[in-house]
């Protein structure tokens, strides 16, 4: 057992003739230097095996981000801080694509021993920015790795915010076919509720069903939506029963009703609507664009490309008529 442990420890050490796992006792500075090198090598090896959720290569946000990382990686490094906008969303702000990018604030403790090199791949870059990207339906593999990422980011720094970017159809596919159990969404939701970090949720495409619940479960005031994204809430669907006995179908139907009631209660809690209101709108699929989602309480802010400032500068109609010398007759 000791020999196995020694062998595994040796495999983590840098391959250098000047380094020894047992530094001479006569040199304290050499021992401290060797210990620091060992810790760095151990952290680097451990971080290299962090699991990542599957990524859709056709996703528009990821495609744009990957293009920038490939052509201008220096624009993603040493970015200035902008706390008002979640990280990497400024790639949509100008045709130059991040000509003045915003820095992703990182943990000081983590940065202390990190090499200043670009992340090796796109998933690593997202995780480096404390971003959990949900870009596929909530199947078991996606749920497992999203929960693992949330736990890892909290362990890394429980004070830094975690960003969840959502473009998911929940537990169904685009055509409405059920591909996952409702428990997949509840598992991620329960993990969110256990976090000590602030959770910033952003809908960058679609948030349907359980994905809409995750969008609304972010920290109040930190729930965002892109201008043309969609959100939709609906009742849980019964999976295909096939040749299942009638008694088993009845049991499954009761479970679906239970999941529906839980979903209604959670949406009521996070949107500020009554249980009756949520239950009524969920009788049929209830689609919401960004303004409607904000009105319903799913999000707090729409990430416009400067339109908010433009709209704020528009002169009200009454003042415009007054300046133009137009008198309104009632």
Swiss-Prot record:
Feature: compositional bias, Low complexity: 8-30
Q: Region (Disordered): which ranges? A: 7-32
Family classification: Belongs to the peptidase S14 family.
Instruction: Report what the protein is called.
Output: ATP-dependent Clp protease proteolytic subunit-related protein 3, chloroplastic
Q: Specify the species.
A: Arabidopsis thaliana (Mouse-ear cress)
Q: Which gene encodes it?
A: CLPR3
- GO molecular function terms noted in the UniProt entry: ATP-dependent peptidase activity; serine-type endopeptidase activity
Q: What happens when the gene is disrupted?
A: Embryo lethal.
Q: How does it assemble?
A: Component of the chloroplastic Clp protease core complex which consist of at least 16 proteins: CLPP4 (3 copies), CLPP5 (3 copies), CLPR4 (2 copies), ClpP1 (1 copy), CLPP6 (1 copy), CLPR2 (1 copy), CLPT1 (1 copy), CLPT2 (1 copy) and 3 copies of CLPP3 and/or CLPR1 and/or CLPR3. The core complex is organized in two heptameric rings, one containing CLPP3,4,5,6 in a 1:2:3:1 ratio and the other CLPP1 and CLPR1,2,3,4 in a 3:1:1:1:1 ratio.
Query: Transit peptide range?
Result: 1-43
Q: Name one Pfam family in it.
A: CLP_protease
Output the SUPFAM superfamilies linked to this UniProt entry. Answer: ClpP/crotonase (SSF52096)
Q: For this chain's UniProt record, which GO biological process terms are given?
A: proteolysis
Going by the entry's taxonomy, the superkingdom of the source organism is recorded as Eukaryota
GO CC terms in record? chloroplast; plastid stroma
Subcellular location(s): the record lists: Plastid, Chloroplast
Which keywords fit this entry according to its UniProt record?
A: Chloroplast, Plastid, Transit peptide
């Amino acid at each position: 057992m000791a020999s196995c442990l020694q062998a595994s420890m040796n495999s983590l050490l840098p391959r250098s003739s000047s380094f020894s796992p047992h530094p001479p006792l006569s040199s304290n500075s050499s021992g401290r230097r060797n210990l620091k090198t060992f810790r760095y090598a151990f952290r680097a090896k451990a971080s290299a095996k962090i699991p990542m959720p599957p990524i859709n290569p056709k996703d528009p946000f990821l495609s744009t981000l990957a293009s920038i990382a490939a052509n201008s990686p220096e624009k993603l490094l040493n970015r200035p801080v902008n706390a008002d906008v979640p990280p990497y969303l400024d790639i949509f702000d100008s045709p130059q694509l991040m000509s003045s990018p915003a820095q992703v604030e990182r943990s000081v403790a983590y940065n202390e021993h990190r090499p200043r090199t670009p992340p090796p791949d796109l998933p690593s870059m997202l995780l480096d920015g404390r971003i959990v990207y949900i870009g596929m339906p909530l199947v078991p593999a996606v749920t497992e790795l999203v929960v693992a990422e949330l736990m890892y980011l909290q362990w890394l720094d429980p004070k830094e915010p975690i960003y969840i970017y959502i473009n998911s159809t929940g537990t169904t596919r685009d055509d409405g076919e059920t591909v996952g159990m409702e428990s997949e969404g509840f598992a991620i939701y329960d993990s969110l509720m256990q976090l000590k970090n602030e959770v910033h949720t952003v809908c960058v495409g679609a948030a349907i069903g359980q994905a809409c619940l995750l969008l609304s479960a972010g920290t109040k005031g930190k729930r965002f939506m892109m201008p043309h994204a969609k959100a939709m809430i609906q009742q849980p669907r019964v999976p295909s029963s096939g040749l299942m006995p009638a008694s088993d179908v009845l049991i499954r139907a009761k479970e679906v009703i239970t999941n529906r009631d839980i979903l209604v209660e959670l949406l009521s809690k996070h949107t500020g609507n009554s249980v009756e209101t949520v239950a009524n709108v969920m009788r049929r699929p209830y689609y919401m664009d960004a303004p409607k989602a904000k009105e319903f309480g799913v999000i707090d802010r729409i990430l416009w490309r400067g339109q908010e400032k433009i709209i704020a500068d528009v002169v009200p109609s009454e003042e415009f008529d007054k300046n133009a010398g137009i008198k309104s007759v009632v």
